């Protein structure tokens, strides 16, 4: 019977470390591999597709294990972290050759979803935010940082909804909380698939003091400390690149909740989840990674301050007016690497020689950028921007003098320091060079002396330098000339006392040279680290210029205009407006522009028309135009006069919230309620067919009540599309409501959508025409025509006037809709046809997707064709 394995010192050491990191995969360094054991090994082997083996396979309790080569470990770590796991990296802290007893090992870094430093391919323009939350009553302290750039923001928030909206907007993958945060709040984070990590209060550090020096609110101070302590605990190194925290209020920016950002497809397509087809995709003509990240931040947080908006507009206008200078700027920007993340790597201690060369190359472009701005600064639009463009010449000169332009990736293998930078290093290199010349001379000398022309001198790490002679030439070798060292299949290797003596000198010079190079490199790195703040300020300045030139490029390409924004007026006058993304996809020649005009007397447009005619596009067009305008960009229109909006609310589309278990209708009502309760007269509301997620009568009653409430109480500018045509009668009683519709005509039996917004309500829905195009049986269509004629002959009941008092019923429109389904005198048909006709009458064609409509038509055809 197999015996149980006695725990070895190594496994005891492993378990001791693992106990400190129970929620992480432990990558335990053994020689050239990172090994995983026990449950970690079983799970990792599945996630990483590794071969699962075992230590002591024949024992009663074999230990599951798997491993990865140390040089390939980063890829495996990335896979685990991308899936929401943590990885603790445990390194050997001493050379196994010189260690006495067990090799000392300790965790040097805990990699988590929120602390990833290495940018992945294609992710250069994305931030990776780690967030932190503390709670006190109904108040929350909230902070976030991107460890790769050092950016730090903090706020005090009084609503869980606002807190969640901030976290979802940041696309955070990890939040740090303490044990005082209520369980229902933690559960809300988990429900959004955010990893929750715990960090209770730790000691004040220099980093905590530096980061929080401009902050005074108690909750803000507490959450900064919690976040910085967590970073120090997980990263186990100096965090000198963390920037001073900037306090902000969500109310400082145009409020866009997560639902609005999704519905408007600002940064992610509803269909694919990718950037393509979004407003970010359209606007992104940035040349730098940091510019791309800043563009996304501006898009997520449009401005409210009119002066800031105008300042951006003025800079965009200057770039538009100076094409050649803008081209020169773009050329310089293409040679600027990611200054923010380079500075982060310098401070983090992970920078290498190539990174420093990229930093030098970037700094070389700054004088060129300054020259461009100085040349187009007639209106002083770039005065502030110029103050941020410090070329940091001392750092550039240091790198130019010290670092080899062709540096290797490794910082410990030599070849990183320039010749002439350090006298001692040059001496070592000369010794190495002379030694190698001596080896070449020895090889030539021995070939001539022995007559063996393929004799060669080689080197490996086991035997050092050797003389190699092929087996075929061994007979030509003078007896006793060399000392045999190694026998190979086809050759013999030899040494001589003279060769070993020279080897010692060469290797000693190489070893000392490599060690000195690393020491010199760290000195350079530390000198650069002292200028981190200057580099970060420069990076922000360059990023902002990159975004503004991107606005200019897009505005020129698509013939955008500078909008006029006002805070003393609520009027909207958008002439020949276009949906920017649809226009890019279709091409300007094919896109049909539409005006949006809402003067002092109009707060609400009630939009009617068939599905797929362009109602949703029209609504999104206005919202995207507002967002672009308040970002400081020009807008797609012939002219644009807009108010500065404080919030945009949308309910467009109907996707079930499967994660939280809420139905389409529940989500619809919650979003509508959020808009109604939070909107002000300075807000913009877009409601697309509210009420379609429930029974017809309930839906229309709710739609009418919502329209009346917004009209009477909220007074926000509102675009409300509906398939309840009866609601158009509300324009007779609601003074600030105006009807518009999407035009459609029949030409040669074909239904043609004009995609043009026209005044007044739609006069028909074209439902039977669509059914005909879908191939419905002729007898069924004739029956539908009969029913439609009878319904159209029925007198219309007027919509009851809306009142402010909520207890007053507003039933007329609902009664009218109910009357559509009262029994009619029908032409004689068989029961089967009558059943299908009844189903058609009750089918909500206007809210069905094309696929749903086709599937239903197919079912009806099957029923009618049965014999």
UniProtKB/Swiss-Prot annotation:
The gene is mutS. ATP binds at residues 609-616. It comes from Latilactobacillus sakei subsp. sakei (strain 23K) (Lactobacillus sakei subsp. sakei). Keywords: ATP-binding, DNA damage, DNA repair, DNA-binding, Nucleotide-binding. Coiled coil: none annotated. GO terms for cellular component: cytosol. PANTHER family: DNA MISMATCH REPAIR PROTEIN MSH1, MITOCHONDRIAL, DNA MISMATCH REPAIR PROTEIN MUTS FAMILY MEMBER. This is DNA mismatch repair protein MutS. HAMAP family: MutS (MF_00096). It comes from the Bacteria. Belongs to the DNA mismatch repair MutS family. The keyword Flavoprotein does not apply. The keyword Cell membrane does not apply. GO terms for biological process: mismatch repair. PROSITE patterns: DNA_MISMATCH_REPAIR_2.
């Amino acid at each position: 019977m197999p015996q149980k394995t006695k725990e070895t010192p190594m496994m005891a050491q492993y378990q001791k470390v693992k106990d400190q990191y129970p929620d992480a995969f432990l990558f335990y360094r053994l020689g050239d591999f990172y090994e995983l054991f026990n449950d970690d090994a079983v799970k990792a082997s599945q996630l990483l597709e590794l071969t699962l083996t075992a230590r002591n396979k024949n024992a009663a309790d074999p230990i599951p294990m798997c491993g990865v080569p140390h040089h390939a470990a980063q890829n495996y770590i990335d896979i685990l972290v991308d899936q929401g796991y943590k990885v603790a990296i445990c390194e050997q802290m001493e050379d196994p050759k010189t260690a006495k007893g067990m090799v000392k090992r300790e965790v040097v870094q805990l990699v988590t979803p929120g602390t990833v430093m290495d940018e992945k391919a294609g992710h250069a323009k994305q931030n990776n935010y780690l967030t932190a939350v503390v709670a006190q009553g109904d108040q929350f302290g909230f902070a976030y940082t991107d460890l790769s750039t050092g950016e730090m923001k903090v706020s005090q928030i009084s609503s869980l909804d606002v807190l969640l909206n901030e976290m979802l907007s940041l696309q955070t993958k990890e939040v740090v909380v303490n044990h005082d945060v209520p369980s229902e709040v933690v559960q809300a984070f988990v429900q959004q698939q955010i990893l929750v990590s715990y960090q209770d209060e730790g000691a004040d550090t220099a980093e905590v003091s530096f980061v929080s020096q401009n902050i005074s609110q108690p909750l803000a101070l507490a959450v900064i400390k919690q976040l910085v302590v967590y970073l120090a605990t997980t990263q186990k190194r100096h965090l000198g690149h963390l920037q001073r925290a900037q306090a902000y209020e969500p109310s400082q920016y145009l409020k866009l909740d997560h639902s609005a950002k999704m519905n408007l497809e600002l940064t992610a397509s509803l269909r694919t989840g990718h950037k393509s087809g979004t407003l970010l995709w359209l606007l992104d003509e940035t040349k730098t990674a940091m510019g791309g990240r800043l563009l996304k931040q501006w898009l997520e947080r449009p401005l409210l301050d009119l002066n800031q908006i105008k300042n951006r507009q003025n800079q965009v206008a200057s770039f538009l007016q100076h094409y050649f200078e803008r081209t020169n700027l773009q050329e310089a920007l293409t040679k600027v690497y990611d200054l923010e993340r380079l500075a982060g790597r310098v401070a983090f201690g992970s920078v290498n020689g190539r990174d420093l060369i990229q930093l030098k190359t970037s700094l070389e472009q700054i004088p060129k950028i300054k020259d461009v701005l100085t040349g187009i600064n007639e209106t002083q639009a770039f005065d502030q921007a110029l103050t941020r463009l410090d070329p940091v010449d001392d750092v550039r000169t240091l790198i130019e003098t010290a670092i080899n332009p062709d540096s290797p990736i490794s910082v410990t293998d030599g070849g990183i320091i320039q010749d002439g930078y350090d006298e001692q290093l040059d001496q070592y290199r000369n010794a190495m060079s002379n030694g190698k010349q001596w080896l070449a001379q020895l090889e030539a000398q021995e070939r001539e002396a022995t007559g063996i022309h393929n004799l060669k001198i080689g080197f490996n790490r086991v035997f050092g330098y050797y003389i190699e002679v092929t087996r075929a030439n061994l007979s030509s070798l003078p007896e006793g000339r060399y000392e045999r060292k190694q026998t190979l299949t086809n050759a013999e290797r030899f040494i001589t006392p003279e060769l070993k003596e020279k080897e010692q000198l060469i290797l000693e010079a190489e070893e000392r040279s490599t060690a000195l190079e690393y020491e010199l490199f760290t000195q350079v790195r530390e000198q650069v680290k002292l200028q981190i703040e200057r580099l970060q300020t420069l990076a922000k300045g360059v990023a902002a210029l990159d975004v503004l030139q991107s606005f200019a490029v897009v505005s020129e390409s698509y013939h955008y205009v500078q909008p006029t924004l006002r805070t003393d007026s609520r009027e909207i006058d958008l002439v020949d407006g276009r949906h920017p993304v649809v226009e890019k996809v279709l091409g300007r020649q094919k896109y049909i522009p539409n005006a949006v005009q809402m003067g002092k007397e109009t707060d609400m447009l009630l939009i009617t028309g068939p599905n797929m005619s362009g109602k949703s596009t029209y609504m999104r067009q206005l919202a995207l135009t507002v967002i672009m305008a308040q970002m400081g960009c020009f807008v797609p229109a012939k002219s644009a006069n807009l108010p500065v909006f404080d919030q945009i609310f949308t309910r467009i589309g109907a996707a079930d919230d499967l994660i939280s278990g809420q139905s389409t209708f529940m989500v619809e009502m919650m979003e509508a309620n959020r808009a109604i309760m939070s909107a002000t007269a300075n807000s913009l509301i877009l409601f697309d067919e509210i009420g379609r997620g429930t029974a017809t009568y309930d839906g229309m009653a709710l739609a009418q009540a919502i329209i009346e409430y917004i009209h009477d109480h909220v007074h926000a500018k509102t675009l409300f599309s509906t398939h309840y045509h009866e609601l158009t009668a509300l324009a007779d009683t609601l003074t600030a409501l105006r009807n518009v519709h999407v035009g459609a005509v029949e030409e040669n039996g074909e239904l043609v959508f004009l995609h043009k917004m026209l005044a007044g309500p739609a006069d028909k829905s074209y439902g039977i025409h669509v059914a005909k195009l879908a191939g419905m049986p002729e007898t069924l269509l004739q029956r539908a025509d009969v029913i439609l004629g009878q319904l159209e002959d029925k007198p219309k009941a007027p919509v009851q006037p809306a009142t402010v008092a909520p207890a007053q019923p507003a039933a007329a429109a609902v009664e009218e809709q109910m009357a559509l389904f009262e029994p009619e005198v029908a032409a004689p048909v068989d029961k089967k046809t009558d059943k299908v006709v009844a189903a058609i009458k009750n089918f909500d064609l206007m809210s069905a997707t094309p696929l749903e409509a086709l599937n239903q038509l197919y079912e009806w055809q099957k029923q009618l064709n049965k014999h």
